[in-house]
């Protein structure tokens, strides 16, 4: 999986994308708070891993 995280100053939000080049899955999101954005990423990774099991 590849995770990209960046801050969009114009919107005042942390944005992220998560892609899996093997399965072609892609998820994305945005939050104003960095910790909430990181939590969303972690929850999404855990969800995708559990789906594959």
Give the role of each language-model region.
Residues 1-15, 39, 43, 47:
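Short N-terminal "domain-start" leader segments
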Residues 4, 15, 32-33, 53:
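Compositionally biased, intrinsically disordered low-complexity segments enriched
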């Amino acid at each position: 999986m590849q995770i990209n995280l960046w801050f969009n100053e114009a919107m005042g939000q942390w944005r992220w994308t998560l892609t899996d080049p093997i399965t072609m899955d892609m998820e994305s999101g945005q939050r104003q708070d960095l910790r909430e954005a990181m939590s969303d990423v972690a929850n999404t990774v855990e969800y995708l891993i559990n789906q594959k099991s």
